[in-house]
Amino acid sequence: MSTTIIGFPRLGEFRELKFTTEKYFRNEITADELLAAAKDLRAKHWNIVKEKGITEIPSNDFSHYDNFLDAAFLFNVVPESVKNLDLTELEQYFALARGYQGEKGDVRALPMKKWFNTNYHYIVPKFEKTTAVKLAGHKIFDEYQEAKDLGLDTRPVVVGPFTFLQLSDFEDGVKAEDFVDSFIAAYQDVFAKLAELGATRIQLDEPALVKDLTADEKALFLNLYNKILADKKGLEVLIQTYFGDVRDVYNDLVNLPVDAIGLDFVEGKKTLELVKGGFPADKTLYAGIVNGKNIWRNNYEKSLAVLEQIPAEKIVLTSSCSLLHVPFTTANEEFEPAILNHFAFAVEKLDELRDLDAIRNGQGAESLAANKELFAIERVGANAELRARIAGLTEADYTRLPAFAEREAIQKDAFKLPLLPTTTIGSFPQTKEVRAKRLAFRKNELSQEEYDAFLAEIIDEWIKWQEEVGFDVLVHGEFERNDMVEYFGQNLSGYLFSKNGWVQSYGMRGVKPPIIWGDVTRLNPITVKWSSYAQSRTDKPVKGMLTGPVTILNWSFPREDISIKDSTLQIALAIKDEVLDLEAAGIKIIQIDEAALREKLPLRRSDWYEDYLDWAIPAFRLVHSTVAPDTQIHTHMCYSEFTDIIPAIDNLDADVISFEASRSNLEILDELKAQNFQTEVGPGVYDIHSPRVPQDGEIDHTIEAILAKVPSSKVWINPDCGLKTRGIKETKESLTKLLEAAKAARKNL
């Protein structure tokens, strides 16, 4: 038996790649300096994996921004608008990821979507009529050669053709089948080039196989692979799946002329059942047995019990998915040993794979005994009062009265907002000064009084600016918050916070998910102080800003000893208490963000309601069910596919919902219209995840497109998302254009 991983974190132990890349974006270092730093980081990571005793090391799992974008460049799926710019290859790459606005042209970034049911986001390639798929890139070969020069025979990794086609966008008049033959040739060219360099195997990632597949999709998969595998150029080919099981294509998959198949034994409900039904003796099974998405220690006894039931003769132990979804290492954390011993980040998961392999080979008795001892400990007790509160909930606790239509009329009369009311999503730019003051306060270098005075001053500035430029509903800017989940978690019992537990979310952006350690209750009011202060500075309504229970759960590392449903209800009651305190303090518009509602939706439609929506939607309703009818509840969602769960979103029973929409060309509007969506909506009118400022007329056109699909009485005008990561200059320029466009649109109503 041997060991491997599907992929390793890219940003570095201390987010070195992030900080170096951001220096490049600011023109503080050259492209050559960026590439050299990335090369050093890859070597460091390969060496860590090697020293931990992992026998098969992947390469090309690294990325400067996103591995899906890497594949687009590898296969020449690059829009003509970017090719026509006089930019270097690296500049083109970042233009697709972030947009480009300069002397050489103006192009928007490609759309960004959630990577299956994770908090990672991938850049969505677009096939045009002019797209000519071919082998065009060199990164996969360069990185294989880099590793080889270090004495490492790695297994190059690339997105497989089926997943690439399934997750890409297509221009009107273009479809996936148009590119099958060219993809077959391109992948075989990759095989040939790798074989020429001395590679012996390749990993093709096909997570799209774990979703519900139609007959046409299965036919596409088989057509691609029967032809690609007809000439493997001497390479051993591994088809790697993750995030679930492959029940729809298992029999077809095991009968392909492939050398190895990677299956997920952590999230794959039916994986063990499928394999027990038979696995070919001539193929190697890569068994994903160590959870790549959560940070709890692996229970060796449970994992070994699964492995003992696998009939495959040749097994390689691996992670259930890439380790980019967990932090780098626990070595830099400051938890007490009694706590820290329960956690395994990416580096520690390498140890777990090595331990399991050793135990399977009749060694490792000491590590097995230590693991048994760890799991024999009762980690944390239950909060009896909280459990009783949840047990006492009834249907009435999940129902807001009066119904939406009556509330809508009451609120329009109460607020007297103009048509197309304008607002922002919540946060304003957090400058170096803001971050420095927060850090100084946390280090006790700044007193509470000094910090409060600073926050009051900056809130005053932004309230005044919003009033001057003409926003209808204001926000306080969230300057006191480092992260929309961590900030709340710090005021809830049952939460722990890592010092360096960063995980890549998109591009160079990292998030530091808190850890749900025990039962969750609110310790004290969280947002009332600054929301009330901001409201006292203006006669216009100021939104209270909260993170919803499902998002807090989904953007935390959840417990594994109770269900995520029970954890979410605990969080919902804590946020409900905060909502009622805000309302009592005179905050009449309260936004409860559910940015991650879609994130943990099961990948198979048959599981959507029973396994998720049947408790996630009620959890949100529980939060706001008892507010007064003239209190307006907003929510916000971003960077996910929402069109297939529109009825469930309407059932949240919010009064207003804002969506990310600009990068996806407002595709959600047709579905809102078709589903007779009742909630008032604010489709984002410009993309905030790019530093690009909308051109004159651009937002006007977007608003026209919105009003063609949604009645003006139902429309709000807002950006896509919060503005925390943007610069002040670009933010004010973009928001001014938003307001000008909204005012112009009102004149035409």
UniProtKB/Swiss-Prot annotation:
Keywords assigned by UniProt, alphabetized: Amino-acid biosynthesis, Metal-binding, Methionine biosynthesis, Methyltransferase, Repeat, Transferase, Zinc
Annotated residues that bind Zn(2+) are located at H636, C638, E660, C721
* Residues where 5-methyltetrahydropteroyltri-L-glutamate binds: R15, E16, L17, K18, K114, W555, E599
> Which cysteines are cross-linked by disulfides?
none
Which InterPro entries would you find in this protein's record?
A: Cbl-indep_Met_Synth_N, Cobalamin-indep_Met_synthase, Met_Synth_C/arc, UROD/MetE-like_sf
Reaction equation(s) it catalyzes: 5-methyltetrahydropteroyltri-L-glutamate + L-homocysteine = tetrahydropteroyltri-L-glutamate + L-methionine
The cofactor remark states: Binds 1 zinc ion per subunit.
Which biological process annotations from GO are given for this protein?
methionine biosynthetic process; methylation
What superkingdom heads the lineage?
Answer: Bacteria
The catalytic activity of this protein is classed by the Enzyme Commission as 2.1.1.14
Give yes or no: UniProt keyword Methyltransferase: yes
Which pathway, metabolic or otherwise, does it act in? Amino-acid biosynthesis; L-methionine biosynthesis via de novo pathway; L-methionine from L-homocysteine (MetE route): step 1/1
Cofactor(s) required, per the database record: Zn(2+)
Which Gene3D superfamilies does the protein's record reference?
A: 3.20.20.210
Residues annotated to bind L-methionine: I425, G426, S427, E478, D593
| Residues at the catalytic site | H689 (proton donor)
Function statement: Catalyzes the transfer of a methyl group from 5-methyltetrahydrofolate to homocysteine resulting in methionine formation.
Q: Which family does it belong to?
A: Belongs to the vitamin-B12 independent methionine synthase family.
Q: What is this protein called?
A: 5-methyltetrahydropteroyltriglutamate--homocysteine methyltransferase
Q: Which organism is it from?
A: Streptococcus thermophilus (strain ATCC BAA-491 / LMD-9)
The organism's lineage is: Bacteria, Bacillati, Bacillota, Bacilli, Lactobacillales
